Amino acid sequence: MHNKVVHTLARSLSAAGGATVRFNFRGVGASEGVHDDGVGETQDALAVVAWVRSRWPAVPLVLGGFSFGGAVAIRAARAAAPAWLITVAPAVDRVRTDDLVLPQVAWLVVQGADDDVVPANTVLEWMGERAPQARVRLLAGTGHFFHGRLHELKACVSEEWPPSLNRLEVPAS
């Protein structure tokens, strides 16, 4: 939650007119609980989605995440049914996926070609086998934390923003 990639993703979505919620998964920061290999963290994400929808039921949901959070967003997307799914360097090899039914939603994957934490070939192979409808943006010369390339991540979000979500208006709460 407190890294520059997550902040850039949140700012990019805010610039498009959306409200954003960032949170820690169980066992991270001051959160209670322990790491659960993506299963419990999916429940955490769905609890946040339920809270957001209770506050702003008429606003389209955009679900996103970075690294482990990206993989959890994929796991949560089928139940959450977002209008758009954005995963940045999703750590698909670090969460359980054998029980996963992928969502049929508009989906953007942004991946650094030189990522040494979540290798691009791992993500591309996983996506190609399971999610051919996803739009993949592979950024040359970019590592896991997008050092010196955050502007490219922001541009990807802006350029790929679905027209159906234009002019989001989030009512004041």
Residue ranges of predicted features:
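Gly/Ala-rich beta-loop-alpha elbow adjacent to hydrolase catalytic centers
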Residues: G65-A73
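Catalytic histidine neighborhood in serine/cysteine hydrolases
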Residues: G128-F145
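Short beta-strand/loop motif that positions the catalytic acidic residue
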Residues: P103-Q104, L108-Q111, D115
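Short, surface-exposed "cap/lid" segments of acyl-processing enzymes
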Residues: M1-N24
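Post-His helix in hydrolase/transferase enzymes
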Residues: H147-W161
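Acidic catalytic loop of the alpha/beta-hydrolase fold
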Residues: A113-V118, H144-F145
